């Protein structure tokens, strides 16, 4: 079976959003070539976070990024290309730079798609304790504290390579003490839910508005026995959810975090933590303001490239 590869030339900051658009339009998998990722690699075998990568083996760009979605060959390309172009262009409304937004199509054979792309994915140590491993890789932990998260990166919903995901994983590692009730909003690949379980969380509920993302999360959860009891469902943010969690996490765009803030406040226990990422530079003041207006206290803020992650808590004595 041949495939239609639709490539979008974009910016590094828009990689995850463009990946989502392609998957939402029917792509069966996504390949990313990001100049920022290549620039972060050390000379030699190991990457910035201990990943096993030979830089010379990676096709790379000098600037920007290219995201390729792989579609069944029978898709109607003349209709698909302008639709993708329009959706990528609208990313400006969310504070993201769509870059060149050049969209093109080519035919690739099954061998190219099914196996060749896998050689560019390798184990990636993203935090002090967490390493993301492609499901087909055989990998042994380097030390007793290293915990492995197995993912199928073919469906690119936050696979650990983007700064927003790394910021959130680092925040989880700082925050989880043990046995917390965690809600993962906009779960995507399920990576945050899996990480939470590895770090000692108790009950974990995960939600996403997108059915494709929910199915992707379920597949990844099944690869990780530690996360076998995580519940995943389709839901828009926390609409209709009425509970009291210890920790709520969300790696989503700032414009979507804004309506989530009051919902998170209502669904947290006093003293509960709210972890957010996916916040581009110029939106960080807005999120700080909205968190504080709601009554949250911001405990920590970290930045990676142009992205921010924040840890806030609900006061124990609510006015």
Curated annotation (Swiss-Prot):
A GO BP entry: methylation
Is the keyword ATP-binding in the record? no
Q: Which residues bind S-adenosyl-L-methionine?
A: 165, 186, 208, 251
Entry GO CC: cytoplasm
State if Transmembrane helix is listed as a keyword. Answer: no
What does it catalyze? L-lysyl-[protein] + 3 S-adenosyl-L-methionine = N(6),N(6),N(6)-trimethyl-L-lysyl-[protein] + 3 S-adenosyl-L-homocysteine + 3 H(+)
EC number annotated for this UniProt entry:
2.1.1.-
Q: Which InterPro entries match?
A: Ribosomal_L11_MeTrfase_PrmA, Ribosomal_PrmA_MeTrfase, SAM-dependent_MTases_sf
Q: Which UniProt keywords apply?
A: Cytoplasm, Methyltransferase, S-adenosyl-L-methionine, Transferase
Quote one Gene Ontology molecular function term: protein-lysine N-methyltransferase activity
> A Pfam family matched by this chain, by name?
PrmA
Compartments where located = Cytoplasm
Primary localization class, coarse: cytoplasm
| Its job | Methylates ribosomal protein L11.
- NCBIfam families documented for this protein: prmA
Q: What family is this protein classified in?
A: Belongs to the methyltransferase superfamily. PrmA family.
- UniProt-recorded name of the protein: Ribosomal protein L11 methyltransferase
What organism does the record attribute this protein to? Limosilactobacillus reuteri (strain DSM 20016) (Lactobacillus reuteri)
């Amino acid at each position: 079976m041949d495939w239609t590869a639709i490539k979008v030339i974009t910016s590094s900051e828009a990689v995850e959003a463009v990946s989502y658009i392609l998957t939402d339009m029917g792509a069966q998998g996504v390949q990313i070539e990001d100049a920022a990722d290549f620039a972060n690699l050390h000379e030699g075998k190991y990457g910035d976070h201990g990943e096993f990568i030979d830089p010379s083996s990676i096709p790379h760009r000098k600037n920007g990024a290219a995201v390729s979605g792989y579609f069944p060959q029978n898709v109607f390309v003349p209709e698909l290309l302008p639709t993708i172009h329009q959706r990528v262009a609208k990313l400006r409304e969310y504070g993201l730079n769509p870059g060149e937004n050049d969209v093109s199509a080519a035919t690739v054979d099954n061998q190219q798609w099914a196996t060749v792309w896998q050689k560019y994915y390798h184990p990636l140590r993203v935090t002090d304790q967490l390493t993301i491993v492609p499901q087909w890789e055989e990998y042994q932990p380097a030390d007793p504290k290293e915990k492995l998260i197995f993912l199928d990166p073919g469906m690119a919903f936050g696979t650990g390579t983007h700064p927003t995901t790394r910021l959130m994983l680092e925040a989880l590692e700082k925050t989880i003490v043990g046995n917390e009730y965690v809600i993962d909003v906009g779960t995507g690949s399920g990576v945050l839910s899996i990480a939470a379980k590895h770090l000692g969380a108790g009950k974990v509920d995960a939600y996403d508005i997108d059915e494709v993302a929910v199915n992707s999360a379920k597949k990844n959860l099944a690869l990780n026995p530690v996360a076998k009891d995580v519940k995943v469902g389709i839901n828009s943010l926390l609409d209709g959810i009425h509970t009291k969690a210890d920790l709520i996490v969300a790696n989503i765009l700032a414009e979507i975090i804004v309506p989530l803030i009051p919902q998170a406040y209502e669904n947290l226990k006093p003293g509960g933590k709210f972890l957010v990422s996916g916040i581009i530079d110029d939106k960080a003041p807005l999120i700080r303001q909205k968190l504080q207006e709601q009554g949250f206290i911001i405990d920590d803020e970290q930045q990676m490239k142009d992205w921010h992650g924040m840890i806030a808590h609900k006061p124990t004595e609510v006015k």
